Amino acid sequence: MQSPAMKRIKSSSHSRWDGSGSVNEMPFPSTIRLQGSFWECSTRRHMCYILRYLFRANGHRHFSYERLDCRNQTLRLPDHLYQPSRPHLLPHLSQLLLVRDSGYL
């Protein structure tokens, strides 16, 4: 089995979370809400991926994968993304993408 990071992502297979509390126009039935430091995620599929953008001071963007089992559970948002003591980081949450990976769906 290929590592998720090795899989190619097509532009049609993901949708940007607009920050309003739900993922719009997803290619499969899914809802994500941010509740404090938790993702509340429900989907009819077994797996989904969150593509996480990492920002550096020079403005270059880097990303990595979080493989998550999204079968109707509440997901802990990684501590490095939710830092109440550093609220200026919270706008970066709008850069999260929910990614469909046909190898797992």
UniProtKB/Swiss-Prot annotation:
Record localization: Mitochondrion
Organism listed in the record: Arabidopsis thaliana
UniProt-annotated stretches for the region Disordered: 1-27
Keywords of the record: Mitochondrion
UniProt protein name: Uncharacterized mitochondrial protein AtMg01100
Additional remark text: A stretch of 270 kb of the mitochondrial genome is duplicated within the centromere of chromosome 2 resulting in the duplication of the gene. The expression of the duplicated gene is not demonstrated.
Annotated Gene Ontology cellular component terms: mitochondrion
Main subcellular location of this protein, as a coarse class: mitochondrion
